[in-house]
Amino acid sequence: MKKFTADFETSTWKDDETWVWAWATCEIGNEENLQIGNDIDSFIDYCKKEKNSTFYFHNLKFDGEFIIYWALTHGFKHVEKKQDVEDNTFTTLISDMGQFYTITLYYSKRK
């Protein structure tokens, strides 16, 4: 399983629209594997291509909101328990104080 660092750059338009305009990942232990993109869709596509990989964000609470929004607007359903995972679902671990620990997207359930 590969591990990456990841970060989003965002912009706000008219106080009510914020979007990812740039992203970058770097494989931990292989700095030659540096990927960049210009929108959240290309980031999600890259994550899907890197099956079973982990992406570490410096500020998951902020960047993770974009991932969750993307998932909810692209046919994914949030499930609370891993035993309820199906295709196109996601799980989160967020504390009652709003601390984000994990967001896991399941494109297809492992059989």
Model-found features: residue ranges?
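Metal-dependent nucleotidyl/phosphoryl-transfer cores and adjacent nucleic-acid-binding surfaces
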Residues: 1-111
